[in-house]
């Protein structure tokens, strides 16, 4: 059974190199975990893929440790309980800051350099003519006052921070401009389910979660808007891993090739086609957006 670290917070991928005691003292373990941004089934598949692939590539034991939420993932890497983590853009910045400069982004999926959020609406609401596909959030603004709306997790880049940023820029008040005020779900899967089931009229979520959903689910949750692009998920490594180990981990990700059968489980688990090397400076725009929302009193 995989261990679960419970700390009041959201989810993401993390890993730490820990020396074992006793007979296993010379057999270090790379402990890995991640933000729970999707369903438990998807996180379990990710855990199995990481343990298997990184274990073989690095020639060592790899253990995936579940984090109960996003904050727990950030707390683990910040307190040196793990050394490597797969984060969203916002939690990635949080993770680097939590390590007081002793951590950096080392890899990202190629598509994360051009990521986006989808706004979706319940089929019945669309069929009733209350909302439909729009070319801008300004066009969506007058319709939202009579509709319920949900974001994803509070620290989700694609499920909350960036869509809130774009909605604010369009002049949408997330309290008075939405029926009942904007709500939040724990992850993207829950957002999609809530909208598809009609428990919420409109929602914002990670586009890959929507694109990968069943046709039946997408029939009940209609895509009505696609945001401009931004940078998102990233692999963050603590400097305590050492340059040699960090280079090996980075290479293990950037060498993943969809044409190789042995790499498909890993790529599928990450919903990725390719990984590329990354630098922390690429996430400056995320820092700027977070600061802007904080300055406006919309984010703590």
What is the meaning of each model-derived region?
Residues 17-19:
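C-terminal motif of bacterial Sec signal peptides marking the signal peptidase cleavage site
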Residues 21-23:
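Bacterial signal peptide processing site
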Residues 35-36, 109-118, 215-253, 257, ...:
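Periplasmic-binding protein-like
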Residues 55-66, 81, 146-148, 170-184, ...:
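A local structural motif
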Residues 64-75, 88-90, 174-193, 229-231:
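Short helix-initiation/N-cap motifs at beta->coil->alpha
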Residues 86-100, 168-169, 193-220, 229:
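A ligand-binding cleft/hinge motif common to bilobed small-molecule-binding domains
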Residues 108-160, 164-170:
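A conserved helix-loop-strand patch within extracytoplasmic ligand-binding domains
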